[in-house]
């Protein structure tokens, strides 16, 4: 079994760009940014429980990494950069710490490296279980209306929130719930030490209005790019800024 994805081919000899979306997104999420790099072959992946991979369920991050490896092999991707946002960024960090053959580097936008103590994990587990129950039992429009009121999305205006609620409500609540439970931050290990000892290139993107993830970025041994005029979802709020950062990274 492999993950559903959309592949677009560029010039031979350049590494692939493999894009991983955030929670409740899909393979289209990164395409406005990715299509600015037409010289590179691009793979836009649907994570388990999402888009064309909605019917795929996993028990945890190990399963996601295994599916990602098999998907890369199926497309004969031998050299690549991983680019992930939020949940996709966490998947990217987990997978790279576990080892991915052919990895050139990882670029994470607003991805959490992991909670650092049992109290934080217990609190996050309580919170995520409440969201899981809501995704299972309530209309998605109601759930996402509250989801986008969370402090991390404080930079969004009312129109942006309405647009995101409408877009994300096309998902399947049950498969979102299953993926949220399987990949909760509560069950993700703290990756800071592994990321510090890495042998691959590591870049971190965060919006200038995303104070939480700017603080987290400062804890990581990564080259950080702050995206102007953007909050947590920087590639949506300022795609040109993210394109500029990726272009700078890929020139090295």
Curated annotation (Swiss-Prot):
Q: Which InterPro entries match?
A: AB_hydrolase_1, AB_hydrolase_fold, SHCHC_synthase_MenH
Keyword Secreted on entry:
no
Q: Name one GO molecular function term.
A: 2-succinyl-6-hydroxy-2,4-cyclohexadiene-1-carboxylate synthase activity
The reply on keyword Signal is no
One short Pfam name that applies is Abhydrolase_6
Going by the UniProt record, its keywords in alphabetical order are: Lyase, Menaquinone biosynthesis
Q: In which pathway does it act?
A: Quinol/quinone metabolism; 1,4-dihydroxy-2-naphthoate biosynthesis; 1,4-dihydroxy-2-naphthoate from chorismate: step 3/7; Quinol/quinone metabolism; menaquinone biosynthesis
GO BP terms in the entry: menaquinone biosynthetic process
Catalytic reactions of this protein? 5-enolpyruvoyl-6-hydroxy-2-succinyl-cyclohex-3-ene-1-carboxylate = (1R,6R)-6-hydroxy-2-succinyl-cyclohexa-2,4-diene-1-carboxylate + pyruvate
Name the EC number(s).
Answer: 4.2.99.20
Gene3D superfamilies per the UniProt record, alphabetical: alpha/beta hydrolase
Q: Which family does it belong to?
A: Belongs to the AB hydrolase superfamily. MenH family.
**Subunit field text:** Monomer.
| Role description | Catalyzes a proton abstraction reaction that results in 2,5-elimination of pyruvate from 2-succinyl-5-enolpyruvyl-6-hydroxy-3-cyclohexene-1-carboxylate (SEPHCHC) and the formation of 2-succinyl-6-hydroxy-2,4-cyclohexadiene-1-carboxylate (SHCHC).
Q: What is this protein called?
A: 2-succinyl-6-hydroxy-2,4-cyclohexadiene-1-carboxylate synthase
> What organism is listed for this UniProt entry?
Escherichia coli (strain ATCC 8739 / DSM 1576 / NBRC 3972 / NCIMB 8545 / WDCM 00012 / Crooks)
């Amino acid at each position: 079994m492999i993950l559903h994805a959309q592949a677009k081919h560029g010039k031979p000899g350049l590494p692939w760009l493999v894009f991983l979306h955030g929670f409740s997104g899909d393979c289209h999420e990164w395409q406005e940014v990715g299509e600015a790099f037409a010289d590179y072959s691009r793979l836009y992946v649907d994570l388990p429980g999402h888009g064309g991979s909605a019917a795929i369920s996993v028990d945890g991050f190990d399963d996601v990494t295994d599916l990602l490896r098999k998907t890369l092999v199926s497309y004969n991707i031998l050299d690549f950069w991983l680019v992930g946002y939020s949940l996709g960024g966490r998947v990217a960090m987990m997978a790279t710490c576990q080892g991915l053959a052919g990895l050139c580097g990882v670029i994470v936008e607003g991805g959490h490296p992991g909670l650092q103590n049992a109290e934080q994990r217990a609190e996050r587990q309580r919170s995520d279980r409440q969201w899981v129950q809501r995704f299972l039992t309530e209309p998605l429009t109601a759930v996402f209306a509250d989801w986008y009121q969370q402090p991390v999305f404080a930079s969004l205006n009312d129109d942006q929130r309405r647009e995101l609620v409408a877009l994300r409500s096309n998902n399947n609540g049950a498969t979102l719930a299953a993926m949220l439970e399987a990949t909760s931050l509560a069950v993700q290990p703290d990756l800071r030490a592994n990321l510090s000892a890495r042998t691959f290139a590591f870049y971190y993107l965060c919006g200038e209005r995303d104070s939480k993830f700017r603080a987290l970025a400062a804890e990581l041994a990564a080259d950080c790019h702050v995206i102007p005029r953007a909050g947590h979802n920087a590639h949506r709020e300022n795609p040109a800024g993210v394109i500029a950062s990726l272009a700078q990274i890929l020139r090295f």
